[in-house]
């Protein structure tokens, strides 16, 4: 038996590296016409999202970026950042989703420390991004993410996200993953002493955590997930990959407020959302005019300090089921 074990080595017939981007290809094949993302007046099906991600990955290579390059995002919870969780690793590159609440000096430090090659920036953060790049040593190119809520001022010097996508094509062959221990994303701490610390996530960890979310929550097929948790926060606890794995629908929310959350929950029949205890507080403390009644169960996952008993009771009375998990992401 020992001899057999020694002879049984990895090969293409018995081993495939764990890779969460495979969830996208599978859901696009099995549920091509199911809604993948809804954001304001925009919506995409899974086959749309798959093609957009392939075009994004293709454009990265056609524009001269290489395997292993760090691609940064300073963005809200919009479709573009969701797509990046697939496009960037599909191109063999590493995603750096930054905390948009940081000042320009801290962002400049992250740009230099991670050796960032390209930065996608939401229009709301364009000024702070320009300041950060101007004092950084790496000086990455900026590509803007246009949003109908932010207008189009002072953007003539920059290419847009959609124009960048137009450079790519849907025939792009995803870069083969050789080792599941390779890095899929780098995230930086905030709120710690000294400079931010970079934390690497490997493909294996992202894949297993994405599936772990399903087990922990006993998540049903085709979930409707509301993006109240920032995607820059540990890659949204890996839920960008989880929702594709369960063929769900992502409801993107640019800014979190009690009115916006209740409206989305009622309109789209949201049955899953995540957030810090402050999000729970917003839901239970909202005034009567902001609350919109809904008849279905909405599951909420929260971390950090355990919510007070009164908050948990109020959440339950309002139609929410709370799961508290342990978090140490800072």
Question: What residues fall within each predicted segment?
Answer:
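Conserved AMP-binding/adenylate-forming core of the ANL superfamily
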Residues: 16, 25, 33-78, 82-86, ...
